[in-house]
Amino acid sequence: MTKRSDDRRVVILQALRDSPRDVSGELLASELGVSRVAVRKHIEALHELGYEIDARAGEGYTLVSSPDAPLPLEVRPLLHGDFYARLEGGRVTGSTNDDARSLALEGAPEGTVVLAAQQTSGRGRLGREWSSPAGGVYASVVLRPAVETPEAIVLPLVVGLGVARGLDTLGVQTLLKWPNDLLCVDGRKVAGVLLEGLSEGWLISWIVAGVGVNVRTAPDRERSASVDELFGRRMPLADVAAAVLDGIAVAYRRWQADGFAPFAAEYESRSYLAGRQVRVSDAAGRVLAEGEVAGIDALGRLLVSTGTGTVPIVAGDVTLRED
């Protein structure tokens, strides 16, 4: 679907939403500068996307209902700035990260996004299953930072902070659990971040920044929360997607210009782990450090104070100690 087609369908939807009565095909054709046949084709395309639009001969069109999905033509008008070059998807897919990876390998530009309201094969860090039920916002962004691989280690933190800022604008406050989770104040998970990429030698070729946000429901009520629950009412998925994408774009561009140092203090102020007793393990389950979280450094490493000193952690699984 081209951006021009999206733009015309946005105009049609806005006209239908703004009118208390049927909108004639003739009026829509005049506003768009196209034929009534072209208008009918756009209406048919909107039907395929899940919009219910009544058409009555001699009267016109009425919008009955809209799909509960972060569709590109709903999200794009809400975005600020010019970072996002291309938006795809919006409904159900296996994995937005897989889709975005395929686009990146085909040469898709930075700022290409794949959106979905449900994933059937979502995954988290280390290939773990990531429950992605219907009514969520799942977005994967193609990034092409001109940096060497070690510099990109902090990107999960930058993206996570961008997501937190985006949710702030919706009135949803979250805390950051290093390295890739966003939690509500009681420790339940609201969103997660997964970055995957390809490097050529020391240089990054591309990175896919994947984000999943619980909006309608939480997969596990004891361990996760939803935006709707925290906000107190039903939040349009397009609004959540646009807020999150805007937050990521601003944070990413600041990181490109100034590195991670300007983010360190804000990240610590939003840290769920600050001052808590934790155990950090590697992928094989080996304990890397146990002690109190002292913060993060300018390189994005988690600092854990043990009985013998402070251990900087580059990567690992963090669990709270109960003892």
Where does each model-flagged region fall?
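N-terminal lobe of the biotin/lipoate ligase/transferase fold
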Residues: 2-166
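Catalytic beta-strand/loop module used to bind and position nucleotide/cofactor moieties
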Residues: 3-4, 8-12, 31, 110, ...
